[in-house]
């Protein structure tokens, strides 16, 4: 956890516009810090559209933010199922236009899945902020 915040805070001057991040690896943390209903977690599992929607809404509310991103996924090597294989990642973005979500299935090892997730999260967040579809490629 924390890859998006790490990437953002590597940018000089990010303290002018980046307030905070929430690393809610455990379901209990999602519930306690982001107000994700326990029933939602039980019904859908952490890696689901419903849960990332609740996560991003909770993050935006708790931070008083205009923009937020939430990620929940299975980076591997274990933890995957037939319905949610390793590499499954759900994203949600909060903006003045509302909440949007995407599901991606990434290939590669744990590090590759996490890096791809950070890239998508930041690129789409920049798109929401700037309204521009073209962003500079991000690399570690």
Feature annotation, model-predicted:
Residues 1-140:
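Short alpha-helical segments enriched in small residues
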